[in-house]
Swiss-Prot record:
Keywords: Coiled coil, DNA-binding, Transcription, Transcription regulation. Pfam families: GreA_GreB, GreA_GreB_N. This is Transcription elongation factor GreB. GO terms for biological process: DNA-templated transcription elongation; regulation of DNA-templated transcription elongation. It comes from Pseudomonas syringae pv. tomato (strain ATCC BAA-871 / DC3000). InterPro entries: GreA/GreB_C_sf, TF_GreA/GreB_CS, Tscrpt_elong_fac_GreA/B, Tscrpt_elong_fac_GreA/B_C, Tscrpt_elong_fac_GreA/B_fam, Tscrpt_elong_fac_GreA/B_N, Tscrpt_elong_fac_GreA/B_N_sf, Tscrpt_elong_fac_GreB. Necessary for efficient RNA polymerase transcription elongation past template-encoded arresting sites. The arresting sites in DNA have the property of trapping a certain fraction of elongating RNA polymerases that pass through, resulting in locked ternary complexes. Cleavage of the nascent transcript by cleavage factors such as GreA or GreB allows the resumption of elongation from the new 3'terminus. GreB releases sequences of up to 9 nucleotides in length. Belongs to the GreA/GreB family. GreB subfamily. GO terms for molecular function: DNA binding; RNA polymerase binding. Residues 52-73 form a coiled coil. It comes from the Bacteria.
Length: 157
């Protein structure tokens, strides 16, 4: 089960998506379904079948977003977090080969479509929690344990 926390920006993005789906996208698709249904035989009507399927997907996403937004807690930045990795931190790490990775530790619902976000529930984020700049971090991966060094920690305020 995913942790039910989210950043303020993530919360606003989900609310914006919900608003778009409910107020703009769904009415548009509903209108298309009604138009396609008016053409007659629905069993061989590709427009009707496609848009009806799309309407079900929109409704499923709307239900999911409403439930998640109701259940989630927005985590605000606190000055006490400074200097350590906690939820919402931008972290830069480096391995022994000199490979760099930079990402933000966020909630599960915020990671999709973003290569620079990782879930607080991921093994990397769990290993990094409470670490400071200069600390070594041992992360369990499918290929075995990997060693990383924390280069920087920054918070958006």
């Amino acid at each position: 089960m995913s942790t039910k926390i989210i950043t303020q920006g993530g919360h606003e993005a989900l609310k914006k998506e919900l608003d778009y789906l409910w107020r703009e996208h769904r009415p548009d698709i509903t209108q298309k379904v009604a138009w396609a249904a008016s053409l007659g035989d629905r069993s061989e009507n590709a427009d009707y079948q496609y848009n009806k399927k799309l309407l079900r997907e929109i409704d499923r996403r709307v239900r999911y977003l409403r439930k998640r937004l109701e259940d989630m807690r927005v985590v605000q930045y606190s000055p006490e977090q400074e200097g350590r990795v906690f939820f919402g931190a931008w972290v830069e790490i480096e391995n022994e080969a000199g490979d760099l990775k930079k990402f933000r530790v966020v909630g599960y619902d915020e990671i999709y479509g973003r290569n620079d976000y990782i879930s607080i529930d991921s093994p990397m984020a769990r290993a990094l929690l409470k670490k400071e700049v200069g600390d070594e971090v041992l992360v369990n991966t499918p290929e075995g344990e990997k060693l990383w060094f924390v280069n920087s920690i920054v918070y958006e305020r």
